[in-house]
Regions:
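Ligand/substrate-recognition segments at binding pockets and active sites
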Residues: 4-5, 98-165
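A ligand-binding cleft/hinge motif common to bilobed small-molecule-binding domains
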Residues: 5-14, 165-169
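Alpha-helical secondary-structure segments
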Residues: 6-7, 14, 25-69, 96, ...
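Short, solvent-exposed loop/beta-turn-alpha elements that line the ligand-binding surface or hinge
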Residues: 10-24, 30-41, 77-92, 102-105, ...
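Residue-level signal for pocket-adjacent positions within structured domains
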Residues: 15, 28, 66-67, 73-74, ...
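Structural transition elements
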Residues: 66-99, 117-121
């Protein structure tokens, strides 16, 4: 079984002999920041405030999904409903970067799985949103095996990973 590419959703939904049912999200797309390379917590916080996750959800996933903070989606019995997602706030991001003395000439290496076009597109949106607040990121698309190797080596600044877990009964 495989996921249906996002670009095919509308045409499949339009088929008369198909009843589309959306289940709870079981895939989490996460961005990891290597703290050794981005040591100031204010910069890491700014990176999160600078991302408009609702825009990504709506533009790339047609609103099918959820914005969460944390590793587990609401489909997990271990999901913590008390955690409120950090809001999109580019002005707060800029303020945190200024407070941290961020060097805007620095370019972060942002590794993404080349095998997932939706995730590559999301990384492009994220990089543009970071650029709007003064954070440069160069996207490096690599195959999944290389991405996992880089993750284990910790030789990255930013890494985007997708996790899917089996739905629970």
């Amino acid at each position: 079984m495989s996921a249906i590419p996002m670009e095919d959703y509308e045409s499949i939904e339009a088929l008369e002999n198909v009843n589309v049912v959306y289940g709870s999200p079981v895939t989490n797309q996460s961005v990891f920041i290597q703290t050794a390379n981005v040591p100031d917590a204010r910069v890491r916080q700014a990176m999160l405030y600078a991302i408009n996750r609702e825009q990504i959800l709506n533009e790339l996933l047609s609103g099918h999904g959820e914005v969460i903070d944390g590793f587990l989606s609401s489909a997990s019995p271990f999901f913590d409903e008390t955690i409120t997602p950090v809001p999109y706030d580019p002005e707060k991001a800029k303020s945190l970067l200024e407070e941290a003395g961020w060097d805007g000439s620095q370019t972060l290496r942002f590794y993404v799985n080349s095998g997932d076009p939706t995730f590559v597109n999301a990384a492009s949106i994220i990089a543009a949103q970071w650029a709007a607040v003064g954070i440069k990121a160069e996207i490096q698309t690599v195959d999944f095996a290389t991405l996992m190797s880089i993750s284990g080596s910790e030789d990255y600044d930013v890494l985007a990973v997708q996790y899917t877990y089996a739905p629970v009964d």
